[in-house]
């Protein structure tokens, strides 16, 4: 079978012919400050947490949808499907509009506790449920390769396509971070602290994301959008310079 893991939160919007309407707005795009303020202050952090287990951050998908609605109304009117980056690739392989619970959790459109779309959040964003992909657990088969995909890949049409997971959730499974209370730290373009939990829980201070995880579990995650590059700067420009000066003085 074939599966996908990839960056989370990005907005890919398709028209009635399943054609991409505009370039994807990725996780690290910070244009949605105004939309996040509206969601957190007008809708309210309490309601957002009730609906999705999370508050609005610029990286999440729902604020991006509101940005398109406000700034590109002609594109907003064309939307027939809303997808995440890895799920669009899976669609091109399978012809199926699908997502998994871990990636869906990062959209601010997903009822994390009940592992389904939040009708309240869809209403706030002006999106019908029909625009959303079907949600699967990460290990589930969403379909099989289309004839076109199978021919291009040199595979057969009975090759299963598996839902997969968002990048951090997939990495957590790979590092064995699935047991209750297990934890990992990831330093890349962004930096995360990831804690697996067998039970659903929301951070009362809204500092951590609460997402669905493997095997019916959940996870809490703290994230910074800039991580390894900051470490490199510290090592190269601060620690490195300091060491050179110390050596020179000696």
Task: Place the predicted regions along the sequence by residue.
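Carbohydrate-associated surface elements
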Residues: 29
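A conserved helix-loop-beta module that forms one wall/lid of the active-site cleft
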Residues: 126-137
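Glycine-rich phosphate-binding loop of ATP-grasp-fold ATP-dependent ligases
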Residues: 22, 103-108
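Residue-level structural signal for beta-strand termini and adjacent loop
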Residues: 25-26
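N-terminal glycine/serine-rich phosphate-binding loop of ATP-dependent small-molecule kinases
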Residues: 1-22, 50, 78, 133, ...
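Active-site core segments that coordinate phosphate-bearing ligands/cofactors
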Residues: 33, 40-98, 108-119, 123-126, ...
């Amino acid at each position: 079978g074939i599966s996908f893991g990839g960056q989370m939160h990005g907005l890919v919007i398709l028209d009635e012919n399943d054609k991409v309407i505009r370039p994807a707005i990725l996780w690290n795009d910070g244009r949605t400050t105004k939309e996040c303020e509206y969601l957190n202050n007008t809708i309210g952090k309490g309601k957002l947490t009730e609906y999705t287990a999370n508050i609005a951050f610029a990286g999440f998908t729902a604020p991006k949808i509101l940005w398109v609605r406000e700034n590109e109304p002609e594109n907003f009117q064309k939307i027939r499907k809303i997808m995440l980056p890895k799920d669009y690739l899976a669609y091109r392989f399978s012809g199926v509009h699908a997502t998994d619970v871990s990636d869906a959790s990062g959209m601010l459109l997903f009822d994390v506790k009940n592992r389904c779309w939040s009708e309240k959040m869809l209403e706030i964003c002006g999106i019908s449920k029909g625009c959303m992909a079907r949600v699967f657990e990460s290990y589930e088969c969403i379909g099989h390769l289309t004839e076109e995909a199978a021919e291009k890949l040199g595979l057969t049409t009975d090759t299963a396509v598996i839902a997969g997971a968002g990048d951090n959730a997939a990495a957590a499974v790979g590092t064995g971070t699935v047991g209750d209370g297990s934890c990992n730290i990831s330093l890349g373009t962004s930096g995360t602290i990831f804690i697996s939990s067998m039970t659903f829980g929301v951070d009362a201070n809204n500092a951590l994301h609460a997402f669905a995880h493997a095997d019916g579990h959940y996870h809490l995650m703290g994230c910074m959008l800039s991580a390894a590059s900051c470490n490199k700067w510290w090592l190269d420009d601060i620690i490195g310079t300091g060491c050179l000066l110390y050596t020179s003085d000696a």
